[in-house]
Each structure stands twice: as structure tokens, then as C-alpha cells.
């Protein structure tokens, strides 16, 4: 074949590839995420990489709403559940994909004491403050507010939240940012930063609900979970940590060698659990004490679907990770595939300081969540996707 013919064929193939990419059916409709909420405009942004992977982000709650990655056959699959329009996000109480703050997880009785001053926070969960007092009807919690887009490029977006002193009862004027970057190795790199003008507490995380099965009507109980953690923090019947750090060995909390999530919880709820901790959490809703000891170069967790071959590894500079097995998904609203989001159709791996750290930081093995003026809060999480 002549050189000119080869070039012609190559050019035609390139054009076909471009056309195929342009004609790709979008997971979400941008227009369905454009509205005004609490006086601010919401929108939808798409991050892409060299491998045609995508991460879809809305500035409402600085949320990840879709993650498109290839399965073992090269077919693109959405790795997270969530709604397909902004109306559902702004009317149905949910944390799907959100940036949680000021303080992710629970604070006992919604009370913190800083320099002998008692601050009362919302008591929105069994008398405790959960996820910054999240309430879609007020709204409270950073996941229920519209963030400002500071910068956006092809593979990254930075969003900013200006939180006033006294918001949800928390002290200090806080400026917080989250940056999502989709790397060419199919990793989502998340960086949270914050500063304050008054001593306060900060604990930010991402609340994506993973389902790696491709078909999100299939529960995540078939997923294989590995947690690099020899210990966890037990909770009581109100989901509040007791202050104890307990070994996982010989308990359903042991995921050190990788285990099917449903092994100890499939088909069970509430009083049906024999294990006290599973009964207290209505399944898994606990914080694990990571062996990685805040080293974000070491794998903290791995989640794998045997159906698609997709896995996600988690790396973090935080000391803990909350594994939540979607125990309270009740079917309110349908997901992007039209499925009702019912119990255990998604699970969360939330990197974090330990729950109630503001009241337990003096206990052995616990960490402070205090942020002072002049300091910068920095938290890092990587969700590394792949197949096997």
C-alpha cells in the first residue's frame, strides 16, 4: 500500500474515533442540573482524562454525581449511585457524592467545648450532630449548599465554600476548598483545604456511594472489601463511638484479608443481627483505625465487584475510614438508571478523623480535629480505579 493510502486510512480511522467520542451518549443532561437554589446558580461539570473516563460534578454540595470507568471488557460503567437531576438532590435528603462539612460523622449530643466555651450544634441524628447538622429543609451542612466554582479545567475542578462564624453553631469564619482531579491513571485525587479566623473543628470527607456492579439494582453485598485496619471504634445503639479502640480479629469487622460484604449482613436488619456492633449499626456503619497511620502512599481500602472486575483502592492521609453499607437507603427517589435506591445498593468509604474526635481527642490513639487561625487544614484522598 502506498504511503498516501496509509495516511488516508489513518486519517479516516482518527475521524471515526473522534466522531464516536462526540456521539457518546451522556450519562447526565447538563440542563437537568441548572437551577437556582438559595439564590445561587447550580450547574454540572465534566472532568475527562486520556482514557475517556469521566467524573461528573455539581456545585450543589460539591458533589460527585457520576464516575465512568472501564470494566474488564472495556465497557464504561458508572461506579456510583445518585440522582439524575438537581431537583431530586435539592428536595430529597441525601449525601450522595457530597463534600461533607464542617464536621463529617457524629459529634456527641451536638456539643463541642473549645477554650472553655461550649458550642451547641444541631442534634439531627439520635440527639447527636451528624455531618455538620445536615438538613435539606433549612438547609444546613455543606452538602446542602451551593459552592462557588473557583477554577475548572479539562480534568480538574476547585470549588470553594465561605462559611460564616456561627453557621450551624460552629465557631469561626471558615474558607474551605475541595479540588477534584481525574488523572490519566484513572484515579480521582481529592484535596480538601480550610482556614479559619477562630479556633474551630474541621473534618471533611466525600460521601460517594459506590456500586461497581454496572447494574445498580444489584446490591453491593457481593463486593469484596479489604480494609487495612486491625482495629475499629465501636459504637453504641445511637451510632455514637464509645471511645474504645477494639481489635477486629475474630469479629465481623475483620476485613484485613478481603471478604464479601454480605457475608455477615445479607438479608438482615435491626434485631436480627446476633453481633452487637452490627445490630447497633444496622449493618456496617463504623470507623476503622487504619494501619496506614496517615500515610497516603499506602492502600487503606479496596472494593471489588466480581461482576465487572472493577475495583477502587483508597489512599488517604487521614487516620480513619468510615465503611457504611447503605443500611438506610429506603428507595426515596430513583437512581440514574431508574432503579429505586434501596438498602445496600451502595456503600461508602469515607476518609476522616474519628467520629466525635472533638470530645475524645485526649483518649489514647485518637486524633485532634482542631483548626486554629494561621493553620491550614489539609486532607487528601485518592480513589484509584482499575480492573482485574
How does the language model describe each region?
Residues 12-13, 217:
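Alpha-helical transmembrane segments and their juxtamembrane interfaces
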Residues 15-17:
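C-terminal motif of bacterial Sec signal peptides marking the signal peptidase cleavage site
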Residues 1-4:
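Positively charged n-region of N-terminal signal peptides that target proteins for export
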